[in-house]
Amino acid sequence: MAECEIGYILQAFSMEKLLKDGTKEFEVKTVACNKKPILTLGGLTIIPDCAISEVDFSNIAALLLPGSSAWGSEDNQEILKKAQECLRNDILVGAICGATLALADYGILDRFKHTSNSLEYLNFFSKKYAGQDLYVCSNSVSDRNLVTANSAGSLEWTKDILKNLNVYSDKKIDAFYNYYSTGNAKYYDELLQ
């Protein structure tokens, strides 16, 4: 798992109490095919909160799929099946980097505008991908309840996810994006107002 790709979205959710006068609507849970520890690409060990079979999908706002070189594993097919069910049930699905390749292999990208590391990446590594006409060359693409991003698009991906979930006002989301993309303190002040 590429933990660097989910840093901004985790930061945005962790700030919710601070930015919403003490209220918190969203809780992040880590989910995997089982509860075995996962070694990330950066060398961190993450212990999932729950297995995919334990998730109550009637009570989630989003399923976010980080990049990973392990998406091709048979173990992850249940997660991809759940992603497809989420999309059918108007639950937001976010996929970045290698997770977009997994969605391509599963046929999901054949029905949504999307992006990935490149069109060539999807064509080369996926034998089943047929969504070429829906590919958009951008860091992040939001279409209905699917948000996809390339490996360099984690900040834009975060912005699109926050807007889709209405976590914050557009003004706060823009301040978050502008602060983390420029480092300009005026946007941090706007974020805290």
Regions found by a protein language model. Give the residues of each.
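Short gly/ser/thr-rich secondary-structure transition/capping motifs
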Residues: 42-50
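Lipid deacylating catalytic domains
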Residues: 37
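Active-site-adjacent pocket-lining segments in enzyme domains
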Residues: 2, 8, 15-34, 49-94, ...
